[in-house]
């Protein structure tokens, strides 16, 4: 499926996926249930500098990964109209999109990379040692 602004590209290799994230104007993350416990795809897109649009999902990690008004736009769960409007807003407002993209890259680097996870694990082990 392809339109002037939306592309469904099907299955991609990891390398092609990364290139698509870097090229995308917006990452629309359509999950509406807690089944998406963390949102790895969301973090991957943010790491590549793609601002996100998400739904509010109480109790999930999605809204912990992307912060409303800081790294992207969060809309009420199931509000498709607000979701579409948020996508349009990020496409139309280049400055806002750039700000969210930069904040998103920093958030992922500071919290969700392997070196950061190793650092946090080492800290836990040191605390256990006493």
Predicted regions and their residues:
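Short glycine/acidic-rich beta->alpha loop that forms part of the nucleotide-sugar donor binding site
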Residues: 34-39, 46, 58
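Acidic donor-binding loop of glycosyltransferase active sites
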Residues: 22-37, 50
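Short alpha-helical donor nucleotide-sugar binding micro-motif in glycosyltransferases
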Residues: 11-12, 19-24
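Conserved acidic donor-binding segment of nucleotide-sugar-dependent glycosyltransferases
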Residues: 67-80, 89-95
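Short hydrophobic beta-strand element within catalytic cores of glycosyltransferases
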Residues: 48-56
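A short, well-ordered alpha-helix in the C-terminal region of glycosyltransferases
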Residues: 82, 89, 96-111, 117-123, ...
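Short alpha-helical segment that forms part of, or immediately flanks, the ligand-binding pocket
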Residues: 18, 40-47, 63-64, 70
């Amino acid at each position: 499926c392809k339109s002037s602004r939306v592309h469904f590209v099907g299955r991609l290799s990891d390398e092609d996926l990364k290139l698509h994230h870097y090229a995308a104007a917006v990452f629309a993350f359509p999950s509406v249930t807690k089944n998406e416990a963390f949102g790895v795809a969301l973090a991957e897109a943010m790491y590549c500098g793609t601002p996100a649009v998400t739904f509010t999902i109480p109790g999930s990690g999605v809204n912990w990964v992307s912060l409303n008004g800081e790294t992207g736009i969060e809309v009420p769960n199931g509000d498709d109209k607000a979701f579409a409007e948020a996508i349009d807003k990020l496409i139309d407002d280049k400055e806002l999109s750039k700000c969210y993209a930069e904040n998103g890259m920093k958030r992922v680097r500071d919290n969700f990379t392997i070196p950061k996870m190793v650092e946090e694990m080492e800290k836990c082990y040191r605390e256990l040692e006493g």
